[in-house]
A protein has these predicted regions:
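Thr-biased low-complexity repeat/linker tracts and other Thr-enriched repetitive architectures
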Residues: 1-508
Length: 508
C-alpha cells in the first residue's frame, strides 16, 4: 500500500452518550487507507476533540489500518472529534451526558422574597441541579422542605437547563428556611413572609391597669394587639381609639414591632368608661373603671330634708350630706364628723352610702335653732335646724303673783303670771290656759300665752280676803292665793246697833 497517499477513510462512532465524568469514554474508530483503499498499518493519526473533551493527540493504526480513539470529558454536551493524516481529515460528534449519579444542588437562589403571609402569595426560589462537574441535570426530582409552617411542594423536577422554581406560601409571618435536597446534597435559604396589612384587625384588647383615680392624671391602661387575618402581628399600624363617659384618650395609637401598643385613659369622672379600639372594619371594646379620689374628699352638699321637729329628745330633724372628690365624684364609705350645738344630740360620725350621701338625724330636748356642722378632711358645711316645743306635753310650769293686796273694789286687779312649757321646759306660745278664781273673784276664763310662754292673769273682786287662783292646761294646774283688801276711801257707817242696854248709872 502507498503510504504517501494515506488518508482517513472512515471515522465511526462506536460508543456514544458516556457520562461527562472525565473517565468514562466515548469511542470512535478511524480507518486509514492509501488512495486505492488499501489498509495502512502503523500510521500516526492526529486527533483533536472540541468542547473541552480530552483525547490522545495521536493514535497509531493497527495491521488492519484501524485504530480506536477514546474521548473523555467533564463537560456535558457535544464534542466534535477530528482525525487527521496528511491533508486528510474527518470529524464526528460524540455526546457526553451529565452524570446523574453525582447529582447535587449546585445553587439555591431566592428570586422573590417578602411575600404576604396570606397562604396564597408565594415567595420563590430557583434551584439548580448539576453533576459533580457542574453539568446541569434535567428531569431530576428535588426534595423540598420549608420551616415555620410554610407550605411547599414536596418535590420539584428540574427543567432542561437543570433549574426549577420553588414556590413557598405561608400563613405565618417571619422567616422560613427552605431546603432543597438531592442524593446527599442540600442547600438552604431563608425567605421572609410579612403580615398582611390589608387584613389588619384588632386581635386583643386587654385591661392591664384598672380602677385608677378619676383625677384627670392617673391612667387606666389597656394593651391592644393588631394582627392580620391569620394572626400575624402587625407593627406600625394606626389604630383609632375612643372612650366614653368623658374619659380622655389619644385619638390614635401606633403599634410597636410586636403588634401591640398600650392605651392610656384618664378621666375626671368616676364610673365605667368603654374604650374602643378600631382598625379597618375591626373593633374591640373593654370597660375600665375610674374611682373617686378619696384624697380630695370634701363636703359637697349639706341639705336639711326634715325640719321643725319637736324638741322631745326622740323626734329628729334630718339633713343629708353628700361627699365628693375634687371633681364632684360621689365618695362611698367616707367617715364624716358631725357636730350640733344648742344641746342637740347627733351621732359623732356617719358613713356615706354608695351614692356618696348619708342622712344625719338630730334630736334635741331644747327648742330653738341648732347649727349642724359636717366635716371631712379640711372641708366643712353647716346648716341650721329648728326644734319646736312639744305642745302635746304642755304644762303649767310657773304661776307667780306679781301684784297683790289690791282693793276689793271690783276693778283694781291683783295680777299673776303663768308660764307654759313642754315636758322639757321649752316655752310654749299660743297656748290656751283655763283660769278660775275663788271667793267671788272675777277673772277671764282663759288666757293665751305670749311668744315667751307667759301670760298675765288679772283678778278683781268686790270681796276682801284671799282668793285662790288656779291656772290649768291639759292635766296640769297650779294655784296661788291673792288677797283683796277693803277700800278705806269709801269708808261709811254701815250699821249702828245697840248690843247692851239698861245698865246702872253708877259711872262704871
Amino acid at each position: 500500500a502507498d503510504v504517501s497517499t494515506a488518508k482517513i477513510a472512515d471515522l465511526v462512532v462506536i460508543k456514544d452518550g458516556s457520562e461527562a465524568d472525565g473517565s468514562t469514554a466515548n469511542t470512535l474508530r478511524a480507518r486509514v487507507t492509501d488512495a486505492f483503499g488499501n489498509a495502512l498499518a502503523g500510521q500516526t493519526v492526529s486527533v483533536m476533540a472540541g468542547n473541552g473533551a480530552t483525547v490522545a493527540p495521536t493514535v497509531i493504526t493497527e495491521p488492519d489500518g484501524t485504530v480506536e480513539i477514546s474521548v473523555t470529558s467533564q463537560t456535558a454536551g457535544i464534542s466534535a472529534v477530528t482525525a487527521s493524516i496528511n491533508s486528510s481529515s474527518q470529524s464526528r460528534d460524540v455526546t457526553f451526558i451529565a452524570d446523574v449519579r453525582t447529582a447535587k444542588i449546585a445553587e439555591l437562589e431566592v428570586i422573590r422574597d417578602n411575600a404576604v403571609a396570606d397562604g396564597s402569595t408565594a415567595n420563590t426560589l430557583q434551584v439548580k441541579v448539576t453533576d459533580a462537574n457542574g453539568n446541569t441535570l434535567a428531569g431530576q426530582a428535588v426534595s423540598v422542605l420549608a420551616g415555620n409552617s410554610a407550605t411547599v411542594a414536596s418535590t420539584v423536577t428540574t427543567k432542561p437547563d437543570g433549574t426549577v422554581e420553588i414556590s413557598v406560601t405561608s400563613q405565618t409571618a417571619g422567616t422560613s428556611t427552605v431546603t432543597a435536597s438531592i442524593n446527599s446534597s442540600s442547600l438552604s435559604r431563608n425567605v421572609t413572609f410579612v403580615a398582611d396589612v390589608s387584613t389588619a384587625k384588632i386581635a386583643d384588647l386587654v385591661v392591664i391597669q384598672d380602677n385608677s383615680v378619676a383625677d384627670g392624671a392617673m391612667a387606666n391602661t389597656l394593651r391592644m394587639r393588631v394582627t392580620d387575618a391569620f394572626g400575624n402581628t402587625l407593627g406600625g399600624q394606626t389604630v383609632s381609639v375612643t372612650a366614653d363617659n368623658s374619659a380622655m384618650v389619644a385619638s390614635t395609637v401606633i403599634t410597636g414591632p410586636d403588634g401591640t401598643v398600650e392605651i392610656s385613659v384618664t378621666s375626671q369622672t368616676a364610673g365605667i368608661s368603654i374604650v374602643t379600639a378600631s382598625i379597618n372594619n375591626s373593633s374591640l371594646s373593654r370597660d375600665v373603671t375610674f374611682v373617686a379620689d378619696v384624697r380630695t374628699a370634701k363636703i359637697a352638699d349639706l341639705v336639711v330634708i326634715k325640719d321643725g321637729s319637736e324638741a322631745d329628745g326622740s323626734t329628729a330633724n334630718t339633713l343629708q350630706v353628700r361627699v365628693t372628690d375634687a371633681f364632684g365624684n360621689a365618695l362611698a364609705g367616707q367617715t364624716v364628723s358631725v357636730l350640733a350645738d344648742n344641746g342637740a344630740t347627733v351621732a359623732p360620725t356617719v358613713t356615706t352610702q354608695p351614692d356618696g350621701t348619708v342622712e344625719i338625724s338630730v334630736t334635741s330636748q331644747t327648742a330653738g335653732v341648732s347649727a349642724v356642722t359636717a366635716t371631712i378632711n379640711s372641708s366643712t358645711q353647716s346648716q341650721n335646724v329648728t326644734f319646736i316645743a312639744d305642745v302635746r306635753t304642755a304644762k303649767i310650769a310657773d304661776l307667780v303673783v306679781i301684784k297683790d293686796g289690791s282693793e276689793a273694789d271690783g276693778s283694781t286687779a291683783n295680777t299673776l303670771q303663768v308660764k307654759v312649757t313642754d315636758a322639757f321646759g321649752n316655752a310654749l306660745a299660743g297656748q290656751t290656759v283655763s283660769v278660775m278664781a275663788g271667793n267671788g273673784a272675777t277673772t277671764a276664763p282663759t288666757v293665751t300665752t305670749q311668744p315667751d310662754g307667759t301670760v298675765e292673769i288679772s283678778v278683781t273682786s268686790q270681796t276682801a280676803g284671799a282668793s285662790t287662783v288656779t291656772a290649768s292646761i291639759n292635766n296640769s294646774s297650779l294655784s296661788q292665793n291673792v288677797t283683796f283688801v277693803a277700800d278705806v276711801s269709801t269708808a261709811k257707817i254701815a250699821d249702828l246697833v245697840v248690843i247692851k242696854d239698861g245698865s246702872e248709872a253708877d259711872g262704871s
